[in-house]
Regions:
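Flexible coil/loop and intrinsically disordered segments
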Residues: 1-2, 6-360
Length: 360
């Protein structure tokens, strides 16, 4: 009889262990949350582990890397340990509510993980250095100050700043950042961007069915009454019904509505600078963005509410104004109906404070 040598037995055990670990990586990376933690697009390679190989050797193909791993020397074992350790580190970051989102932002926007010193990355410092480099922040007495006053639609890094605000919201609330919701997102204006009344016409008539039912629900939930708002909305709705068949009178109705301080908000009252301010911008899935087009705020909010499972956390809070003090919100219940200059300012300042709180 021939017996396996100690060396061949060790090799077989190593290969069995590698196979089990390989299978674990393949299985766990099929979880969308973990996959999108360090990938921006769906897997098209067939094998999920290829994404780990590409981090370590961006220019190597899967076949080349796999061939090296099939070797039968100590280097093979060492190489595999690096692969598996990187996977374990990615998973550890992903599962950590305190730093996971910061790690995701850093990997996506600032640096790669090819350097084996990735375990020593200080994500807060990486992000602070990036913000200062791009002139989005300054540092004084060891504290970072975020500059959002001049950041708006079309500017460099506007998407990244909104992403970072969402990340910091999740870190602050100790909730897992929704990595799988970060794909196919558009930057969307909360208050309608398009003021072309021809385009706005149909959306306007369709949208204004919503306010009365919404007001009634808000008043009921808060046990409040505000007859002025209710009467104005009821009157508006009645006029809409009368004019619906005579759309050539739309312009007259539109002009009349703009004369009322409350009702004018239904059709938007932000000037061009406010519309493009970061406080009027959110990230929304492209499908939802297209579905409500130029609808007014109350209609948009209804769409958002129905699709809340697909929405980034801070976007939801923006549409439902959870950054307002509760007593202040109840005192200004009409704010529930539209998005104002004050909202733009509040959301921008809220995002600024969030980022500073988490990074300092």
């Amino acid at each position: 009889h021939s017996f396996p040598t100690r060396r061949s037995s060790d090799l077989e055990l190593t290969q069995i262990q590698m196979a089990a670990e390989w299978d674990r990586i393949e299985l766990e990376l099929q979880d969308e949350s973990l996959w999108y933690f360090f990938n921006q697009t769906p897997n098209t390679e067939g094998t999920y582990i290829d994404a780990i190989f590409k981090i370590m050797h961006p220019n190597n193909t899967f076949a080349e890397f796999y061939k090296e791993l099939r070797g039968k020397d100590a280097n093979t074992k060492n190489m595999w340990r690096k692969v598996y350790n990187l996977f374990l580190q990615l998973k550890e970051w992903h599962d950590d509510e305190k730093i996971g989102g910061l790690a995701w932002f850093t990997i996506k926007n600032i640096r790669n993980l090819k350097n084996e010193n990735y375990k020593n990355i200080d994500f807060r410092e990486e992000i602070k250095d990036w913000l200062k480099k791009e002139r989005l922040a300054c540092e004084s007495n060891g504290k970072i100050e975020i500059k959002l006053d001049e950041v708006g639609y079309g500017d460099d890094y506007i998407r990244e700043i909104i992403e970072l605000a969402n990340v910091c919201y999740c870190v602050d609330k100790r909730i897992l950042f929704p990595y799988e919701k970060t794909r196919n997102l558009d930057i969307e204006h909360i208050s309608a961007q398009d003021d072309d009344l021809e385009k706005f016409n149909n959306a306007f008539f369709e949208s204004l069915d919503a306010p009365l039912a919404f007001v009634n629900k808000v008043l009921e939930d808060h046990n409040l009454t505000n007859n002025d708002i209710k009467t104005n909305v009821e009157t508006l709705k009645q006029r809409i019904e009368e004019e619906r068949q005579n759309k050539h009178k739309f312009w007259e109705l539109y002009d009349d509505i703009k004369k009322f301080p409350i009702l004018s908000q239904f059709v938007g009252s932000l000037d061009e600078k406010e519309k493009n301010n970061i406080g009027n911008l959110v990230l929304l899935p492209k499908s939802i963005n297209r579905s409500y087009k130029n609808a007014i705020f109350t209609k948009k909010r209804n769409v958002i509410a129905k699709a809340c499972g697909e929405i980034m956390p801070l976007t939801l809070r923006a549409f439902f104004r959870e950054y307002y003090d509760v007593q202040e919100a109840e005192k200004n219940i009409e704010f529930a109906l539209y998005w104002t200059e004050e909202d733009v300012k509040c959301l921008k300042n809220y995002e600024k404070r969030l980022i500073e709180k988490i990074l300092n």
